[in-house]
Amino acid sequence: MSLVLTDLRVTYPDGDRVLTAVDEVTLQVDAGQLVAVVGPSGSGKSSLLAVAATLLRPDSGRVVIGGVDTGGLSAAGRARLRLAEVGIVFQQPNLLASLTAVEQILAAHHMRGRSVRQQRRAAAELLAAVGLDGKQHRRPHQLSGGERQRVNIARALSGRPSVLLVDEPTAALDHDRGRQIVELLAEITRQHQVATVMVTHDTEHLEHADEVVEMRDGRLSALSSHR
C-alpha cells in the first residue's frame, strides 16, 4: 500500500490576491518508507499534510491512498477512507487529562467493534510497541513530553493504517527525546509496513528517514536518499 500525490495545487484567497500554498507537488511514499518533508514555517508543509490526509481538497491534482483515488469520493467517502487507512500524529498530543495511557487508546474510534478483551490486548500491544510497556495506567501528567507523544503515535496506529502522517513530532521535545521519537517512527514504519510522511522544520535526526525532501514556497525538491 502506498500514498501517491500527483501535481497537487492548493491556493487560498488573500484579499485581492490568491496565495499558492502547494504548487504542482508530486510525491510517492511506499509501504515501509519514511519520507521527511522539511522547510520553514509558511512553506506549505501543513497544507500538503492536510491534503494527504483528505482533510483539505486540492484545487487540482490527485491523492491516491492504497490504490484509491480520493478525487471522486464524497466527503463521507473520504472520511471512511481516512478512518480505515490513515493515521495522523498531530504536533500536540491532546490527550484527555482524566484518562490513562491505555484508556486513551481504548477511546479511539478505531477500537469500536472489537470485544473488550480484544480492545485491551490491542491497546497494551500498541503501547508496548512504542516503548510504554509498564506505563499503561499512567495519566498524561505522569508522563514526560516524549512519552505523551508515544501515546499519540500508538493512538494513530490503533486503526492499523496503511498511511501514517506525522506533523512536527519533535517540536516540543529536547534533542534526545526528539531523536528517540524519530527513531521510533522509523522502526514503526518498517515493522508495520506503513507509508509514513513526517513534516518537520527540525533538520536534526533526518538520517532515520529513507528520503528527505525540502518544501519552499509550495514546491518540493529532493535533498537526499539515505537507503
Q: What are these model-predicted stretches?
A:
Residues 16, 70-87:
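ABC ATPase NBD coupling module
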Residues 83, 138-141, 159:
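Conserved signature/switch motifs of ABC ATPase nucleotide-binding domains
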Residues 164-167:
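Catalytic Walker B motif of ABC-type/P-loop ATPase nucleotide-binding domains
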